Amino acid sequence: MPTIRGQSILIIGGSSGIGAAVAKYACGDGVKVSVASSNKGRVEKALKKIQALVPASEILGFTVDLSQYDLESRLEKLFKEVVDATGGPLDHVVMTAGTGNMVSLSEYTAKAFQESAPLHFIAPLMVGKVAPRFMNRHWKSSITFTSGAFGKKPAKGYCVIASAVGALDAATRALALELAPIRVNAVSPGPTVTEMFGPPSEALDKAVAAMGAQSLLGKLGRPEDVAEAYIYLMRDANTTGTIVDSNGGAFLQ
């Protein structure tokens, strides 16, 4: 099996949820991990948790806010800080950052688009523009974005987010052509129980159980389930321009 041990990875949005799970698994595989998020406190908390779970982990934390329109310069600053701190170019970039709070079509306005565009529409393209300058330009290297099941199977009430992930899927394939031999892929999760569901509570547990009971597997995905797909895409040096689904069979229902 191909190894990623000793390689260097930056996870943008790696302080919680799926990104934090990817960071944990990567540390366990002996990867040098850099985690970036908009909240310094969450980054520090995530690092402490991962270091407790994987004592031998090589992990650093950084802060970056990609919700503003000057995100290109913010990304350039982040990538420079990471390669300076780790002592060399990156092998992999993973982007899991997102808010998950897009409005419904009836509430959608041009202002709502302007507020969500930097993170959900512009950031992936800017990562594709900026990241290669700080990466090993080789087919072993990869960029992996985070898409969503609504891009392939929309649901009523989720038109806006379906449009965003549909655009990301198209960008993923186009960037695979533009950035070759660096591989570009995306993971498309279905419903996944992360912090975005809200704080732990009995009511949340019941809601998650009810939603899971309707799925093909009788459960919802967990960050650790979906994180496996990102690790796979880093390992598989023959995959590019691909959207990998991790949704519990949602497209079959």
From Swiss-Prot:
Active site: 147
SUPFAM superfamilies, alphabetized: NAD(P)-binding Rossmann-fold domains
Binding site for NADP(+): 15-16, 18, 38-39, 42, 65, 129, 194
Superkingdom of origin organism: Eukaryota
Top EC group: oxidoreductase
Keywords per UniProt: Monooxygenase, NADP, Oxidoreductase
E.C. no: 1.-.-.-
UniProt-listed InterPro entries: NAD(P)-bd_dom_sf, SDR_fam, SDR_superfamily_enzyme
Pathway: Mycotoxin biosynthesis
GO molecular function: monooxygenase activity
Family: Belongs to the short-chain dehydrogenases/reductases (SDR) family.
Function: Short-chain dehydrogenase/reductase; part of the core atranone cluster (CAC) which products are predicted to catalyze most or all steps of mycotoxin atranone synthesis, starting from geranylgeranyl pyrophosphate (GGPP). The initial cyclization of GGPP to dolabellane is probably performed by the terpene cyclase ATR13. The Baeyer-Villiger oxidation near the end of the atranone synthesis, which converts atranones D and E to atranones F and G is predicted to be catalyzed by the monooxygenase ATR8.
Name of the protein in question: Short-chain dehydrogenase/reductase ATR9
